[in-house]
C-alpha cells in the first residue's frame, strides 16, 4: 500500500503501531511525526493544507481543549491525563478525530 499523506499514515500507525513505532506510545508517535515532517521538508515535499493545519493548529487546539497553557509537546499534554503511553497513544487518535471533525465543521461554516 502506498501512503499518500499524513492522515493515511496515521491510520496505518493506529492499526499497526509496532511496524512504525516499535510499540504503541504517544511519545514515540510524537517523535515519529516530527521526523516525518522533517523528512518531507528535506525532500522538498510540501505538506498539504490539511497536514499544515495539523502541525500548526493541533497543539494550540489541545491546549484550549484541556485548559492548559504550556510550551510542552502535545504528547506531554496528552500524558497529563493518561496513566501510560499506550493509553496516551489511544487518546491521541480520539483527540485527532475530534480535532478533524471540528476543523471540518469550521470549514463548512466559513464557506
Task: Locate predicted features.
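Short terminal alpha-helical segments
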Residues: 2-37
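C-terminal ligand-sensing/allosteric alpha-helical core of TetR-family HTH transcriptional regulators
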Residues: 8-13, 92-95, 99
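Short, hydrophobic/amphipathic alpha-helical patches that form generic packing surfaces
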Residues: 28-40, 60, 95-98
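Residue-level marker of positions within ordered structural domains that often coincide
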Residues: 18, 37-41, 67, 101
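Intrinsically disordered or highly flexible coil/loop and linker segments, enriched in small
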Residues: 19-22, 42-45, 71, 105
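Amphipathic protein-protein interaction modules
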Residues: 43-97
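Short glycine-rich, low-complexity/disordered patches
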Residues: 25, 72-75, 106-111
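Intrinsically disordered, low-complexity terminal tails and linkers in eukaryotic proteins, enriched
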Residues: 94-111
Amino acid at each position: 500500500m502506498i501512503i499518500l499523506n499524513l492522515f493515511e499514515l496515521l491510520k496505518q500507525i493506529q492499526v499497526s503501531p509496532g511496524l512504525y513505532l516499535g510499540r504503541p506510545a504517544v511519545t514515540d508517535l510524537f517523535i515519529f511525526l516530527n521526523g516525518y515532517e522533517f523528512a518531507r521538508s528535506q525532500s522538498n515535499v510540501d505538506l498539504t493544507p490539511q497536514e499544515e493545519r495539523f502541525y500548526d493548529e493541533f497543539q494550540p487546539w489541545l491546549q484550549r481543549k484541556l485548559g492548559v497553557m504550556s510550551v510542552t509537546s502535545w504528547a506531554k499534554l496528552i500524558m497529563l491525563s493518561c496513566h501510560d503511553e499506550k493509553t496516551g497513544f489511544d487518546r491521541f487518535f480520539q483527540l485527532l478525530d475530534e480535532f478533524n471533525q471540528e476543523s471540518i465543521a469550521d470549514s463548512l461554516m466559513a464557506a
